[in-house]
């Protein structure tokens, strides 16, 4: 896997930003003629499918690749991975930082302009954990036509992004759930999902997962049921032995990558030996 740490000037955020991009590349077995037809090239046969992978609170663009084997999983399955640093801004507009615009418009513009990855919705996916799960739902339901599928792991479906950005972590209880439901519909996963339904648009396919020892398990189950009631195609996974933790997310990101409803040529070729 070719791994790039990119630092560039964002025209949305008006400052330099860091992202990590991993791109499938020639493997050691391929370079030694142990797999494939013996020929090697750094020119892809087609543009790679891409997964925009969002981190959780307190993390950054390097956390997913540091705490999981996502590089290995992506290399085996030949899919590009894009990680960014969204601070604790929940991937929405807070103050002068418009991370919603950055993620939805500028990040794909930069990545697709600089790397051999697809712009086609058929080959574009988004996923995230905790705060990143919240961001995934907001972006996927704001622009459902842009993503084939989404993955939300231990998603903070009732997060208050403004309080989070100020260092205030609100209790995820029934009272707070009602408060979230009445918030600005532009940043409420619940309201955005209802809007997709009301406008008659198809939902991206949904992969939803949460550990049963996680304090937000019940809110995840409730949101899963809400999506099903709205007509979304939801795949659900849970594990009795895990809470809000990286060992669970490492398991889930591999399951998610295997689950993706891919139609690209690389998927048809099957998993590679690394």
Residue locations for each model-derived region?
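Non-catalytic cap/lid and distal C-terminal segments of serine-dependent acyl enzymes
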Residues: 1-274
């Amino acid at each position: 896997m070719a791994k790039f740490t990119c630092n560039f000037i964002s025209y949305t955020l008006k400052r330099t930003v860091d992202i990590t991009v991993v791109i499938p590349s020639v493997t050691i077995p391929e370079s030694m003629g142990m797999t494939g037809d013996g020929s090697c090239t750094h020119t892809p046969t087609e543009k790679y499918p891409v997964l925009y992978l969002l981190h959780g609170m307190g993390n950054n663009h390097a956390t997913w690749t540091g705490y999981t084997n996502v590089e290995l999983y992506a290399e085996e399955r030949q899919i590009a991975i894009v990680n960014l640093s969204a601070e604790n801004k929940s991937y929405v507009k807070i103050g002068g930082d418009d991370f919603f615009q950055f993620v939805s418009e500028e990040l794909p513009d930069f990545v697709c302009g600089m790397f051999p990855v697809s712009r086609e919705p058929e080959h574009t996916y988004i996923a995230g954990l905790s705060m990143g799960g919240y961001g995934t739902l907001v972006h996927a339901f704001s622009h459902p036509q842009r993503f084939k599928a989404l993955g939300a792991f231990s998603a903070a479906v009732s997060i208050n992004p403004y309080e989070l950005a100020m260092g205030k972590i609100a209790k995820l209880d029934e009272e707070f759930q009602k408060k979230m439901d009445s918030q600005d519909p532009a940043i409420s996963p619940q309201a955005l999902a209802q809007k997709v339904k009301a406008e008659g648009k198809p939902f991206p396919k949904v992969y939803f997962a949460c550990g049963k020892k996680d304090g937000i398990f019940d809110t995840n189950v409730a949101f899963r049921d809400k999506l099903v009631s709205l007509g979304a195609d939801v795949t659900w996974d849970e594990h009795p032995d895990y809470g809000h933790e990286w060992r669970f997310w490492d398991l889930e990101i591999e399951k998610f990558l295997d689950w993706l409803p891919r139609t690209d040529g690389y998927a048809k070729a099957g998993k590679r030996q690394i």
